[in-house]
């Protein structure tokens, strides 16, 4: 059984959460694969390009997916179409990303992005703004806001998340009995509750619960 961590938007395999789960799983003899979903080309990033990276990484083998923010949404999208995903841990999953992201920019900024084709976005891994193509919006329109996967999953979401509303995870969990939702005293990063998340997700990720 393979385990993959899918990082968030404008992040990288070197994120704090990725390294936390890599270390914890290593302590239990489980290697964690952390692909670079942008493949070094953030400007031309799309949901389809990231799903293709995930598909190559899993190589059709049974796997467990851990996804953070946009990585959580991508994990849900991928699992909905690929039964070789056996279970998921979604951390503040960015449901509705294709519709929410441009809307939250505001009408003027979103229209300027559509017109020029590029938007400067702060990239956390690089510590500076990087251009992002409008193709991520156009490509994203083909994907469901709430991917309908049936595999067992744990969702962890911060009650004080100002980036992805916890109400989205609540809405998803109500209609999906395969999902266990944990609402935590944290923000979008969840860094202050990682040990708590490990307590209820560790056995699940190992296939023991």
What are these regions (language model features)?
Residues 1-39:
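Short, surface-exposed "cap/lid" segments of acyl-processing enzymes
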Residues 5-9, 66, 91, 156:
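Short hydrophobic segments within beta-strands
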Residues 15-22, 48, 165-170:
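Short, surface-exposed alpha-helical segments at coil->helix boundaries
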Residues 25, 78-82:
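Aromatic pocket-lining residues of Rossmann-like dinucleotide-binding sites
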Residues 34-40, 93, 186:
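Active-site loop/turn elements of alpha/beta-hydrolase fold enzymes
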Residues 35-58:
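Catalytic nucleophile-loop/oxyanion-hole region of alpha/beta-hydrolase
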Residues 67-75:
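Gly/Ala-rich beta-loop-alpha elbow adjacent to hydrolase catalytic centers
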Residues 85-87, 91-209:
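The alpha/beta-hydrolase serine catalytic core
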């Amino acid at each position: 059984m393979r385990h993959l961590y899918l990082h968030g938007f404008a992040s990288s395999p070197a994120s704090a959460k990725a390294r936390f789960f890599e270390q914890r799983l290593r302590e239990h003899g489980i290697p964690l694969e952390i692909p670079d979903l942008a493949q070094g080309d953030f400007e031309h990033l799309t949901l389809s390009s990231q799903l293709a990276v995930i598909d190559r990484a899993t190589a059709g083998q049974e796997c467990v997916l851990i996804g953070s923010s946009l990585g959580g949404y991508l994990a849900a999208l991928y699992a909905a179409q690929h039964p070789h995903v056996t279970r998921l841990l979604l951390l503040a999953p960015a449901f509705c990303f294709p519709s929410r992201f441009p809307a939250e920019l505001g009408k003027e900024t979103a229209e300027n992005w559509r017109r020029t084709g590029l938007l400067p976005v702060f990239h956390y891994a690089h510590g500076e703004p990087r251009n992002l193509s409008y193709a991520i919006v156009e490509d994203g329109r083909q994907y469901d806001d709430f991917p309908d996967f049936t595999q067992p999953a744990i969702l962890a979401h911060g009650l004080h998340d100002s980036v992805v509303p916890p109400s989205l995870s609540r809405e998803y969990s109500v209609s999906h009995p395969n999902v266990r939702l944990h609402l935590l005293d944290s923000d979008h990063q969840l860094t202050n509750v990682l040990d708590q998340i490990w307590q209820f997700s560790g056995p699940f990720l190992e296939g023991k619960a």
